[in-house]
Structure formats: C-alpha cells, structure tokens
Amino acid sequence: EKLGQGQQPRQWLQPRQGQQGYYPTSPQQSGQGQQLGQGQQGYYPTSPQQSGQGQQGYDSPYHVSAEHQAASLKVAKAQQLAAQLPAMCRLEGGDALLASQ
C-alpha cells in the first residue's frame, strides 16, 4: 500500500505536464491579438500610399503648370482627410459627427 501511495504522486505530476499543455494555448490566443495588430498595420499603409500618390504628383508636374501642382496637392490632402474621417466616425460614432456637420 505504501508503494501504491508513492505511485499516486507520480500521477499528480502528470497533470502538471497537462497544465503545460494549457499554457501554450494562452500565448496562441495573445498571438491572435497580435494578428489583429497586423490588421491595423494593413490600415496604416493606406495613408502612406495616398501620400505616395501625392509624390507621384511631384514627379510628373515638371512639365505641367504650377496650378496643376497645387490642384494635385489639394486632391492628395482631400484624400487623406477622407481616409481619416471614416476612422473618426467609427471611433466617435457617425451620428455625432453627422450632426455636428
């Protein structure tokens, strides 16, 4: 009987190994949270791409008048504002912004 009781604690050690199997799941869940962060990184590149379009406006207009340069800059700024506004609407609530406008 004493030997049998000695073997039982060994069985208690095995559930600890099973708990180690549970711990990796929580880092995996936090890893899914990091994937959400990657999704946010997918939103940020849109604004640099828009600014990149503005830079394309800088490169090409050497053969174009300064008025067209100014117009292209206004369009680029308007695109950036339009990209920022939907994010603000989602954060603060579209109804409040629509009412203020």
UniProtKB/Swiss-Prot annotation:
Functionally, this protein is described as follows: Glutenins are high-molecular weight seed storage proteins of wheat endosperm. Thought to be responsible for the visco-elastic property of wheat dough.
The entry's protein name is: Glutenin, high molecular weight subunit PC256
| InterPro entries to which the protein is assigned, alphabetical | Glutenin
Q: Which GO terms describe its molecular function?
A: nutrient reservoir activity
Which ranges are annotated Low complexity under compositional bias?
A: 41-62
A further note on this protein reads:
Glutenins are coded by several genes on each of the group 1 chromosomes of wheat.
Protein family: Belongs to the gliadin/glutenin family.
Q: What are the alphabetically sorted keywords of the record?
A: Disulfide bond, Repeat, Seed storage protein, Storage protein
Note down the stretches annotated as region Disordered.
1-65
Q: What is the lineage of its organism?
A: Eukaryota, Viridiplantae, Streptophyta, Embryophyta, Tracheophyta
Xref: Pfam families: Glutenin_hmw
Q: How does it assemble?
A: Disulfide-bridge linked aggregates.
Q: Where is the composition biased (Polar residues)?
A: 1-27
